[in-house]
């Protein structure tokens, strides 16, 4: 369970992905323009060798195969020179990408933790409401039904009762009224 990433509602958010492949290809072509040139020269030499072979010109075929080898050597030199030339820039880019990834992971984690805190608070609120309802229900069950209250308190309760009652409310003080008082407040 420790290896799995934390679930979040932000997992499918496309804002967390930045560089698409076409932008990356364009950037690489701008960084090392000699590599595509060498690849193009190699392909052209192979094409010319194929055409010369179809025509039966063996001298031209050999010349084009040599040109293909030179073009491939040029491409390899361009790749090596570009890697040496852009090494520090690539290292800086990798460090920047790592920092951005860490920042993205931190924001995702913070959002997930905030979401968990909200859910936890909702659970605590629900549990406290549920406990209050249970307390009210237990209080209503523990109330003795056969005993008469003292005459003075009975008169006072009867005087306050018409003001406290609402139309449609039952005359009993059971569980239903306790739940209504909890959810709608004591009126």
UniProtKB/Swiss-Prot annotation:
The keyword Transmembrane helix applies. It comes from the Eukaryota. It is a multi-pass membrane protein. One of its GO terms (biological process) is mitochondrial respirasome assembly. It is found in: Mitochondrion membrane. Residues 6-97 form the HIG1 domain. Residues 86-109 form a coiled coil. The keyword Transmembrane helix applies. The chain crosses the membrane at residues 33-49, 64-86. Residues 153-168 have a biased composition (Basic and acidic residues). It holds the Pfam family HIG_1_N. Residues 136-187 are annotated as: Disordered. Keywords: Coiled coil, Membrane, Mitochondrion, Transmembrane, Transmembrane helix. One of its GO terms (cellular component) is mitochondrial membrane. Associates with the respiratory chain complex III/complex IV supercomplex. Cytochrome c oxidase subunit which plays a role in assembly of respiratory supercomplexes. Belongs to the RCF1 family. This is Respiratory supercomplex factor 1, mitochondrial. It comes from Arthroderma otae (strain ATCC MYA-4605 / CBS 113480).
């Amino acid at each position: 369970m420790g290896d799995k990433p934390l679930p979040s509602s932000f997992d499918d958010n496309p804002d967390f992905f930045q560089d698409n492949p076409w932008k990356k290809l364009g950037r690489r072509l701008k960084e090392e323009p000699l590599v595509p040139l060498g690849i193009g020269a190699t392909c052209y030499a192979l094409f010319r060798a194929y055409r010369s072979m179809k025509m039966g010109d063996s001298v031209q075929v050999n010349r084009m195969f040599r040109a293909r080898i030179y073009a491939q050597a040029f491409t390899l030199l361009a790749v090596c020179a570009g890697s040496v030339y852009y090494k520090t820039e690539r290292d800086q880019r990798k460090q920047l990408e790592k920092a951005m990834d860490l920042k993205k992971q931190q924001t995702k984690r913070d959002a997930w933790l905030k979401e968990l805190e909200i859910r936890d608070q909702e659970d605590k609120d629900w549990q406290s409401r549920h406990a209050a309802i249970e307390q009210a229900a237990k209080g209503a069950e523990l109330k003795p039904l056969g005993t008469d209250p003292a005459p003075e308190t009975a008169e006072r309760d009867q005087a306050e009762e018409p003001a406290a009652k609402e139309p449609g409310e039952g005359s009993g003080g059971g569980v239903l009224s306790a739940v209504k008082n909890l959810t709608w407040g004591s009126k």
